[in-house]
A protein has these predicted regions:
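N-terminal donor/sugar-recognition subdomains of glycan-related enzymes
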Residues: 1-27, 141-170
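Conserved mixed alpha/beta catalytic, RNA-binding, or beta-rich assembly cores of soluble enzyme
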Residues: 2-114
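Residue-identity detector for threonine
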Residues: 5, 37, 66, 102, ...
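Well-ordered, non-membrane alpha-helical segments in soluble/globular domains
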Residues: 45-47, 70-72, 125-127, 158-166
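Long, charge-dense
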Residues: 91-152
């Protein structure tokens, strides 16, 4: 059996500001919760979901509101922690930006030479602020655990479901 070693994240980890909680730096899991409201109006059930994720062992748990800068920040924060191998995507899709569908397309297809997310249908699915190397490293480093495929909206935001997926990844 191969020995798994854990790396200490850099001193300034996570490098990007954002609306997230930091948990166990040595965990292989980050949780991305889609946000369908403004940051100052985050519903209690979504705030609780991020707390549950960190308490269940996630390295990071936070919100994704936009398909461009939001995804770029997630990529930077995840790549900065080499221990993260799984990204759990959950929550409720935002009507305007479709960050969930865009994140799914990014995980599945990557970007073209102009950093356009292949297969994305959102308005601005470009990742201009990070290098192609960092983008590719994220895609090689992580596997998407997608809860958005569930038709049941409650299941996509169910704390027990998120805990079970985190435990399966750990």
């Amino acid at each position: 059996m191969r020995k798994v070693t854990k790396a200490k994240p850099p001193e300034l980890y996570p490098p990007e500001d954002g609306s997230y909680l930091r948990g166990n730096d040595y965990s292989p899991v980050a949780v991305v919760i889609l946000l369908h409201t403004d940051y100052d109006k985050i519903p209690a059930f979504l705030k609780d979901l991020s707390k549950v994720a960190v308490e269940a062992g996630a390295a990071l748990a936070g919100f994704l509101q936009t398909e461009k800068i939001g995804i770029e920040k997630i990529i930077c924060d995840v790549v900065a922690n080499p221990n993260i191998r799984y990204v759990i995507l959950c929550g409720v899709e935002s009507a305007g930006h479709h960050p969930g569908k865009t994140f799914e397309a990014f995980a599945a297809n990557g970007v073209d030479d102009n950093r356009l997310i292949i297969g994305a249908t959102s308005l601005t699915p470009y990742l201009h602020n990070i290098s192609l190397e960092v983008i590719e490293r994220f895609r090689k480093q992580t596997k998407l655990m997608n809860l958005l495929f569930e038709d049941d909206r409650k299941l996509r935001t169910d704390p027990e479901t998120v805990k079970r997926v985190i435990n399966a990844c750990i």
